[in-house]
A protein has these predicted regions:
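Conserved alpha-helical scaffold flanking the Walker A/P-loop in AAA+ ATPase domains
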Residues: 204, 261-266, 276-299, 331-332
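Walker B catalytic acidic pair
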Residues: 296, 302-303, 314
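Basic, amphipathic alpha-helical bundle interface domains used for macromolecular binding and assembly
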Residues: 34, 40-45, 60, 67-77, ...
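Catalytic P-loop NTPase motifs of RecA-like helicase/translocase cores
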Residues: 111, 301-308, 351
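Walker A/P-loop
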Residues: 215-256
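Peripheral, non-AAA+ core regions of ATP-driven protein-machinery
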Residues: 1-214, 218-224, 327, 467, ...
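Short loop/turn elements that form and flank the Walker-type P-loop nucleotide-binding site
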Residues: 59-62, 98-99, 129-131, 149, ...
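Conserved inter-motif catalytic segment of the P-loop NTP-binding fold
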Residues: 239-275, 282-283, 389, 429-437, ...
Length: 505
């Protein structure tokens, strides 16, 4: 007898349909799974056999063949345990064939419990696109999968519960999507940072336009402290961003039933010893790396020159495209990587170059060699470069209360609202994403601005990419000021962020 159970597969953040075909025939007892299964899929034979017997049902003593179609696509993971088990029960007449619009996925324990799998949200979204109406998933994945709008998600705790449901004895209650918390709470605040008003202004501009930023200053100046507070002024994630980022985290199994969706913008801060694979992703399973885990959030690289040159150069393409494609002999996977790059570094190897105390002992050649660890093409992709000076004692003792993150965030959200209206109907999300058509339309300079830009271009030796990035930053500064056009003062501030000695070297 032949049965067919609908299931799903997941490769990266892309889901696809998989049909699990089970055939029971006369012959010597055997249990074969075909259709390019990996080791975990092949091991399903023992898990399924034990689960069926443990729950008081008969396992066929005959020839049993399971095909995972399409047979030319490699199948990986334990998510096919549940559809294989149901296919066997249907083929032996234990239960009726489920409707073709229902899909099943989940790992099965020897006792028949249904355990969570990775990539549940991606497969739920794929089920929605395919046109499936019902999705049966492990209870631990149900809250995550329920964010697919037009699919009814049923949480399954064990196979006995599912069998009773399919027989019509006791129905499983569908899972509803949990309520999203719109205002994230942070344990840190900009109000905790004394002085550094110029740096805070640069971070506000970066947050308002989604610009990449580099902080340069001596040890103890507060570079890391300021960078870690950047997420507190970023606008809240919308539903589409939450789902996109959650898909990446789900691939690694980083979601939980209590926290099924990524609600706050990620802040990833890998150590400077991070490997190329850990940063960009890869491995035998083609898993996402730090750049993808920072999607719709912040990727913070402290001690930038200490990172491997290969790691830094890998970032150039994702910074431009907002995605990264990992290719191996087994295939290729594309992950989103729309992140804000925030970097911090000392001005020289010892960290005290240019400090009023005169503590630096680095020669000009040493300073240039240290700066050269950050390549020109990577610097070209950083919109804002600003110095973080050491604080004076009177600044530390000041009783003036700095602006809170909530106040700064209001200005940032106002500027982002202007950008959403401006880019309605386009692929741009913020000013940092503007391409040539948008730059021509929204970043036109008047005669005074054009002359100022020409002087800066010639005196600073700017590239065409730097020219475009200055105009993007100027557009953001104008948005923060509520100006429809880019004025000379907006352009001057944007140019100021490209005049650091690091660029000149």
């Amino acid at each position: 007898m032949l049965s067919k159970i609908q299931s799903l597969g997941c490769r990266g953040v892309t889901g696809y349909a998989v049909s699990v075909e089970c055939h029971v025939s006369n012959g010597l007892p055997g249990f074969d799974i075909v259709g390019l299964p990996d080791a975990a899929v092949k091991e399903a034979r023992e898990r399924v056999r034990s689960a069926i017997k443990t729950n008081g049902m008969k396992f066929p003593v005959s020839r049993l063949t399971v095909n995972l179609a399409p047979a030319d696509t490699r199948k990986a993971g334990t998510l096919y345990d549940l559809p294989v088990l149901l296919g066997i029960l249907c083929a032996t007449g234990e239960i009726r064939q489920p409707p073709a619009t229902a899909a099943f996925l989940g790992e099965v324990s020897l006792a028949g419990e249904v355990r969570p799998v990775t990539g549940a949200l991606t497969m739920a979204l794929a089920a929605e696109q395919i046109g499936l109406k019902e999705l049966y998933v492990p209870a631990g994945n149900a809250a995550e999968a329920a964010f697919a709008d037009h699919v009814t998600v049923y949480p399954v705790e064990n196979i006995a519960q599912l069998v009773h449901h399919l027989r019509g004895d006791r129905r499983i209650a569908p899972k509803t999507a949990p309520r999203l918390e719109t205002e994230p709470r942070f344990p840190v605040d900009f109000a905790e940072v004394k002085a550094q008003e110029n740096v805070k202004r640069a971070l506000e501009v970066a947050a308002a336009g989604g610009h990449n930023i580099l902080l340069i200053g001596p040890p103890g100046a507060g570079k890391s402290m300021l960078a870690k507070r950047l997420p507190t002024i970023l606008p809240a994630m919308n539903r589409a961003e939450m789902i996109e980022t959650t898909q990446v985290y789900s691939v690694l199994g980083l979601t939980t039933p209590d926290d099924p969706v990524v609600r706050t913008r990620p802040f990833r801060a890998p150590h400077h010893t991070v490997s190329n694979v850990a940063m960009s992703g890869g491995g035998s399973a083609l898993q996402p790396g730090e750049m993808s885990l920072a999607d719709n959030g912040v990727l913070f690289l402290d001690e930038l020159p200490e990172f491997s040159p290969a790691v830094l150069e890998t970032m150039r393409q994702p910074l431009e495209d907002g995605s990264i494609t990992i290719s191996r002999a087994t295939g290729s996977v594309t992950y989103p990587s729309r992140f804000m790059l925030v970097c911090a570094m000392n001005p020289c190897k010892c960290g005290w170059y240019g400090h009023p105390s005169g503590r630096c002992r680095c020669s000009p050649r040493d300073v240039r060699r240290y700066h050269a660890r950050v390549s020109g093409p990577l610097l070209d992709r950083i919109d804002i470069i600003t110095e973080v000076p050491s604080l004076h004692f009177d600044e530390l003792r000041s009783t003036t209360v700095p602006e809170s993150s909530a106040v700064v965030k209001q200005r940032v959200e106002t500027a982002r609202a202007i950008q959403r209206e401006r880019f309605k109907g386009t692929s741009c999300r913020c000013n940092a994403n503007m391409q040539t058509p948008e730059l021509r339309r929204f970043c036109e300079l008047d005669e005074t601005g054009a002359l100022l830009m020409q002087q800066a271009f010639e005196s600073l030796g700017l590239t065409a990419r730097s020219y475009d990035r200055i105009r993007r930053v100027a557009r953001t500064i104008a948005d923060l000021a509520g100006s429809e056009s880019i004025l000379p003062e907006h352009l001057s501030e944007a140019i100021q962020y490209r005049t650091h000695q690091l660029i000149q070297n």
